[in-house]
Swiss-Prot record:
Keywords: Aminopeptidase, Hydrolase, Metal-binding, Metalloprotease, Protease, Zinc
UniProt xrefs under Pfam families: Peptidase_M18 (PF02127)
Stated family: Belongs to the peptidase M18 family.
NCBIfam families named in the record: PRK02256.1
Record-listed Zn(2+) binding positions: 95, 170, 434
Classification via InterPro entries: M18_aminopeptidase_1, Peptidase_M18, Peptidase_M18_dom2
Gene from which the chain derives: apeA
Coiled-coil blocks: none
Protein name: Probable M18 family aminopeptidase 1
Organism: Borreliella afzelii (strain PKo)
Disulfide bonds: none
Biological-process GO terms, alphabetical: proteolysis
Amino acid sequence: MKKQNPWISLSEEEKNQIFNFSENYKKFISKFKTEREVASYALDKAKKKGFLNAEEKKNLMPGDKIFYTCREKTVAFAIIGKNPIENGMNLIVSHTDSPRLDAKPSPISEENELVFLKTNYYGGIKKYQWLSTPLSIRGVIFLKNGEKVEINIGDNENDPVFIIPDILPHLDRKIQRNKKSDEIIEGENLKILIGSLPIETKEKNKVKLATLQLIKEKYKIEEEDFVSSEIEIVPAGTAKDVGFDKALIGAYGQDDKICVYTSLESIFDLEEIPNKTAICFLVDKEEIGSTGSTGLDSRYLEYFVSDMIFKIKKSEYNNLHVQKALWNSKSISADVCAAINPLFSSVHDEQNAPKLGYGIPIMKYTGHGGKSMASDADAELVSYIRQLLNKNNIAWQVATLGKVEEGGGGTVAKFLAGYGIRTIDMGPAVISMHSPMEITSKFDLYNAYLAYKAFYKE
């Protein structure tokens, strides 16, 4: 199924529209790098667009714009549709978390008069890619009195950055050079250099004490306070255009913030009341299996759908309404997929692999080997999506995750399908996924926005 490169047929006006849309996305992904930051941004923008806190409303009716928030990391936005909600909803679900490093509960140590922050990697990273890379420290810490302190260090002009120092090639022959890629550095050694100046004292660990003193002076944070913290270490720096033609975007966290951004913008831009209730659901913890109380496996979806239906049905409410609403719904698992990387093309079945710049990929299934752990969308749903995209002149392509026995992976699709929701994976293709600098196409970004908006409208 060969297709011409879609860029060729675009007018200058269409190209400008795509490039202009991409500029705001670049600003977004440069600034908001953690799940808390993304959730906060989404809530702030939703309020400006007229969305109200559903927990404070007693009744809901068609056209109402509402939001739900779960522990400052997971958020849902809904526009109540014209049709009875038990006839089904249209959901787009993306995730706010990205692979990163997390600080350990007792993280600060001194070794050879240098101070390090000990970490535990989060999600599927290639550990060696994080060596000698400028890093930013972000997150929240609760002090012993319960006060919340937010930190964001490494991305402002006058901020320091932080580094995991690599070994020089002159001395790496025995310790590193002949090892497998996942053994180049042990997870326990992903320690971030954060200080080197000592303090004048008779105590040991003079540099650690000096670093802790600086942290306390600026942020009121003491060493024990790290126990009640969520400190995330992410790549420093901003999104960049890639290539002379500037048609690609390089940035950290595009898995899955490219889908977060496009699903948000598309629901915010709906001009008319949709036929079916439209839901934009941004969830946490996808990169580690959707676990925890803010992950999709927590049943928060069932909670807020039940609350919506109760406020619509009032005295007529019963649990069967909830089950019917979920069972009759359609969902897009809005997550990125792996584009063909010409340097490593052998891992793909090229006939079934997406390319950068060919539109939004439709991925019927993910999983491993024999489709293990996949939700595997039914042909009827794929047909519906295909017709929807064609009807709206939206560029699309097919996608699978590599050759059959090459590897594999999963998304939130199986958790949505567990409610009986008909679900398909559909998100832009990415090169260098899970790296500190992921690459996407501006054309695919814009067509994801168009596709999600068309889906909400139905």
